Structures are given as C-alpha cells and as structure tokens.
A protein has these predicted regions:
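Intrinsic disorder/low-complexity segments in short proteins, especially the signal peptide
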Residues: 12-13, 29, 64, 71
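Compositionally biased, intrinsically disordered low-complexity segments
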Residues: 6, 25-27, 73
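Mixed-charge, Lys/Arg-enriched low-complexity segments
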Residues: 43-76
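Short aromatic-glycine-(Arg/Gly/Cys) micro-motifs in beta-strand/loop hairpins
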Residues: 26-47
C-alpha cells in the first residue's frame, strides 16, 4: 500500500540574492511515528532532501546544508 507524503508548508530560502523554495512534507513512516522531509530543487534533476523527526528539525537541517550545497554547485 502506497502512502503519499503530505505537503505541510513551503518557505523561501534567500542566499546571495537568489530565492530557493523549501517544501516541507510529512510521511507516515509507522503508526505512531512520522518522518518529515525538506526538499529543495536547485535545478531540474538536482534536488536536495533532508529529513528530521519534526518539520522544524527537517527545515533547520535543510537551511544549514543549503549554503554549502549551493556553493559546491557553483564550483562545478
């Protein structure tokens, strides 16, 4: 049985004059426990995903890794 993620909210992340959209999803992993995911598409085919036990933790993790991720992509 497939259970789809539920979009909880979206936020904008600003970095060096560019805006990136961060989508926060909840995925029911088990009966009592849910997994939260933050997803940001940097370009077609280049998506960054972070997870956490809460929406806030997933968002915080994504906001922490995005600057490094964006900078590393600019080096390629």
């Amino acid at each position: 049985m497939f259970i789809a993620e539920e979009l909880l909210f979206s936020e904008r992340f600003l970095w060096e004059g560019k805006s990136y959209v961060v989508h926060i999803y909840r995925h029911p992993a088990r009966k009592e426990r849910c997994l939260h995911m933050a997803e940001t598409e940097l370009s077609p085919g280049d998506t960054i995903i972070s997870d956490g036990q809460s929406a806030e933790k997933a968002l915080h993790k994504q906001q922490t890794v995005l600057p490094l991720t964006i900078l590393s992509r600019s080096l390629l």
